[in-house]
Amino acid sequence: MEAFSQLVQQAAQAFEKARTPAELEDAKAAFLGKSGELTARMKQLASLPVDEKKARGAEINAAKQQVEAALTARRQAMADAELAQQLRAESLDVTLPGRRRGSGGLHPITRAMERIEAIFGSMGFEVADGPEIETDWFNFTALNTPADHPARSMHDTFYVEGGQVLRTHTSPMQIRHAVRHVKAHRAALDAGLPMPEIRVIAPGRTYRVDSDATHSPMFHQVEGLWVGQNISFKDLKSVYVSFIRAFFETSDLQIRFRPSYFPFTEPSAEIDMMFGSGPLKGRWLEVSGSGQVHPQVIRNMGLDPERYIGFAFGSGIDRLAMLRYGVSDLRLFFDGDLRFLSQFK
């Protein structure tokens, strides 16, 4: 029995000396493996008498249980030591302030577009949509823009393959909408019946070769169109003044219409506004182009300009957003600086 006690002690010492799981497995094999000390003792039982075999077998089993217990204890000690080391390496100071999870928000241009759509929606205007890569017909010809017009120059317009262009305004969406509207009511028109009015706005991205603090090669525009049988300049003024007051949430402003020229309207006017208070008080600010729809544009919609007339306007959404939020540099909207954009949540 004393020999087995020494064997158990040797095994326990070997396990304690092991510093890695691999070394511990080697020590285990030395005592419990196929060629280990205890396994060799078990094999020797076959040559012993029956009575002695029983007593010696009990001693070996007792020694084996003690060795296995020592092995289990060493494994647990090594696991505890490894866990303690990991905890020390990954320790956290729970007194430190937590990190706030960032939250997203609508871009200020998106906010402005949604506001514009809501205001005109309350006036009965539909919202049109259309492609940003346009044909020459819808972008220029249908809008009475002649082939020699400066707007067709490569200095002002982005051309793509196939003679198409990145739309320079959102008016093409109005023409597409009007053509679909007229086709849908062609039977009534042919019968001499009045057609339901075309009342639509077209917000979206547009592209021109321009870039500075107040201009971008990509910018957002909203254009409005109202075509019917008795639409006048008075209606244009009423609608736009109502819109601008609702957009800026104030009646403390003035609006003026200045004579101008656009190939798709006749007569045409620039629309300026002036705040009655605030940092921009007393300054006339250009916010839109407008006018009565040119008769040729009415024809291109499929309507008789002798019976139908309308007005149109086009405003820069980025410009309106700059004025609403007090932003002096247009490029701030598109730099992706979260310090700037987070102000609009």
Curated annotation (Swiss-Prot):
EC number: 6.1.1.20
Top-level taxonomic group: Bacteria
Reactions this protein catalyses: tRNA(Phe) + L-phenylalanine + ATP = L-phenylalanyl-tRNA(Phe) + AMP + diphosphate + H(+)
InterPro entries in UniProt: aa-tRNA-synth_II (IPR006195), aa-tRNA-synth_II/BPL/LPL (IPR045864), Phe-tRNA-synth_IIc_asu (IPR004529), Phe-tRNA_ligase_II_N (IPR004188), Phe_tRNA_ligase_alpha1_bac (IPR022911), Phenylalanyl-tRNA_Synthase (IPR002319), tRNA-bd_arm (IPR010978)
SUPFAM superfamilies cross-referenced by the UniProt entry: Class II aaRS and biotin synthetases (SSF55681), tRNA-binding arm (SSF46589)
Disulfide bonds: none
Pfam families linked to this entry: Phe_tRNA-synt_N (PF02912), tRNA-synt_2d (PF01409)
CDD domains assigned: PheRS_alpha_core
UniProt cofactor note: Binds 2 magnesium ions per tetramer.
Gene Ontology molecular function terms on file: ATP binding; magnesium ion binding; phenylalanine-tRNA ligase activity; tRNA binding
UniProtKB keywords: Aminoacyl-tRNA synthetase, ATP-binding, Cytoplasm, Ligase, Magnesium, Metal-binding, Nucleotide-binding, Protein biosynthesis
Keyword Aminoacyl-tRNA synthetase: yes
Major place of residence: cytoplasm
Subcellular location: Cytoplasm
Cofactor(s) listed: Mg(2+)
Cellular compartments per GO CC: cytoplasm
Major enzyme class: ligase
Any GO BP: phenylalanyl-tRNA aminoacylation
Binding site for Mg(2+): 266
The name this protein goes by in its record: Phenylalanine--tRNA ligase alpha subunit
Organism: Methylibium petroleiphilum (strain ATCC BAA-1232 / LMG 22953 / PM1)
Gene: pheS
